[in-house]
């Protein structure tokens, strides 16, 4: 009997996956326990941040009896929960944003070139995996890594590029961005500058 063709089954197991390379960062690992009839069952919980360092980032939490399995589960979950964040010049945020989750509150500010990543712990991992090179941030609420990451991602979801803002308002990008002139224009001519003696 001839073998039947696999038509649409297996969800492309034989097909090579064309996924971009992701970097991951282990943020926290905790020992957890579950009380069962015979006593306590111990395991590990891992918190992992994953990103392509070009504007996509996600995080995941995994639990297992062994550390490597917990990290693997967390990494897989993080890859399924990726969000895309528009970056200004591929290095910083377009505008200042705030984020919160539970008791976690964070403030993130755009920064000039050469500033570096001014952020602590879990927030730094998110920015590094996202590909941000210049940012100033502060966490004012809960220092729990889970809440800090969720608050950071909440703020990053509200990040918009000038193009996105212009399309929402039905305007051109030039109308949204401020003019870079030193002096205001009056009917096409530069306004006189008053000199005080």
Curated annotation (Swiss-Prot):
UniProt biased composition (Basic and acidic residues): 1-17, 172-186
Leader sequence segment: none
Cellular component terms per the entry's GO annotation: small ribosomal subunit
Keyword field: Ribonucleoprotein, Ribosomal protein, RNA-binding, rRNA-binding
Matches recorded under Gene3D superfamilies: 3.30.160.20, 3.30.230.10
Top-level taxon: Bacteria
One GO biological process term: translation
Keyword Acetylation recorded: no
Disulfide partners: none
Region (Disordered): 1-22, 158-197
Gene Ontology MF, one: rRNA binding
Keyword ATP-binding appears in the UniProt entry: no
InterPro entries assigned: Ribosomal_Su5_D2-typ_SF, Ribosomal_uS5, Ribosomal_uS5_bac-type, Ribosomal_uS5_C, Ribosomal_uS5_N, Ribosomal_uS5_N_CS, Ribsml_uS5_D2-typ_fold_subgr
Domain S5 DRBM: 22-85
HAMAP family, sorted: Ribosomal_uS5_B (MF_01307_B)
NCBIfam families to which the protein is assigned, alphabetical: rpsE_bact
Job of this protein: With S4 and S12 plays an important role in translational accuracy.
Subunit structure comment from the entry: Part of the 30S ribosomal subunit. Contacts proteins S4 and S8.
Domain notes: The N-terminal domain interacts with the head of the 30S subunit; the C-terminal domain interacts with the body and contacts protein S4. The interaction surface between S4 and S5 is involved in control of translational fidelity.
Family: Belongs to the universal ribosomal protein uS5 family.
Name of this protein: Small ribosomal subunit protein uS5
Organism for this UniProt entry: Jannaschia sp. (strain CCS1)
